[in-house]
């Protein structure tokens, strides 16, 4: 971001500044700041004018995913699923059943070794109400239709607009897939 570059420049951290600038030319990265904390769904909705009618990747910056059984990064593998299925894709990780109430949880049918056709998404369910122990893992590739669903999503848990609720609504008229990655999540 421009803010980071200005800070590095003023601190005379030229080598780090050069790396940041090189990275910024590799992809079209856009940061959106919420004026009020109204949930992840609200934050994503602020990106609508930037995204337009294109599919887009959403990476939550407070989480790192490290793939252990492939030389390909998680997002690259998700992109391959998206290109094949022409549908939204979300990263999934197995969590202990007693921890499902901390995450958005997905349910669906396994169609390949690491791919599920999703039919259920629930934000922070009680363990006995969870459709599985597959947690949404901070990486998404969305079709632009998510924005219509976000605009109609009422406030949910903690009186916030929950991305998981909009995704669940999207399942009624769009396919969505889960990519089950093998590795570690650092949150």
Give names to the regions the model predicted.
Residues 17-27, 81, 109-115, 169-171:
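Short, conserved catalytic or adaptor-binding loops enriched in Gly and charged residues
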Residues 66-148, 153, 157:
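Conserved core of the sugar-phosphate nucleotidyltransferase
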Residues 1-60, 65-66:
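Conserved N-terminal catalytic core of the sugar/cofactor nucleotidyltransferase
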Residues 37-40, 71, 160:
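A conditional alpha-helix N-cap/helix-loop micro-motif detector
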Residues 36-40, 97-98, 127-129, 185-187:
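A short acidic, often aromatic-flanked loop/helix-cap motif at beta-alpha or helix-coil junctions
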Residues 3-10, 28, 52, 83-85, ...:
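Terminal amphipathic alpha-helical/low-complexity segments used for targeting or macromolecular assembly
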Residues 58, 90-91, 178:
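Structural beta-sheet core signal
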């Amino acid at each position: 971001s421009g803010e980071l570059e200005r800070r590095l420049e003023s601190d005379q951290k030229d080598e780090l500044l050069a790396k940041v600038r090189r990275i910024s030319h590799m992809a079209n990265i856009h940061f959106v700041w919420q004026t009020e904390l109204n949930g992840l769904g609200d934050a994503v909705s602020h990106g609508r004018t930037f995204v337009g009618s294109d599919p887009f990747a959403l990476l939550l910056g407070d989480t790192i995913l490290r793939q252990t059984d492939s030389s390909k990064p998680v997002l690259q593998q998700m992109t391959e699923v998206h290109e094949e299925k022409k549908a939204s894709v979300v990263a999934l990780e197995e969590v202990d059943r007693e921890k499902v109430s901390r995450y958005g949880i997905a349910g669906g049918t396994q169609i390949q070794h690491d791919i599920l056709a999703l039919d259920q998404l629930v934000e922070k369910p009680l363990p006995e109400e969870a459709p599985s122990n597959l947690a949404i893992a901070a990486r998404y590739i969305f079709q632009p239709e998510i924005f219509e669903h976000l605009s109609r999503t009422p406030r949910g848990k903690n009186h916030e607009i929950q991305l998981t609720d909009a995704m669940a609504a999207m399942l009624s008229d769009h396919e969505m897939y889960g990519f089950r990655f093998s590795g570690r999540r650092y949150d």
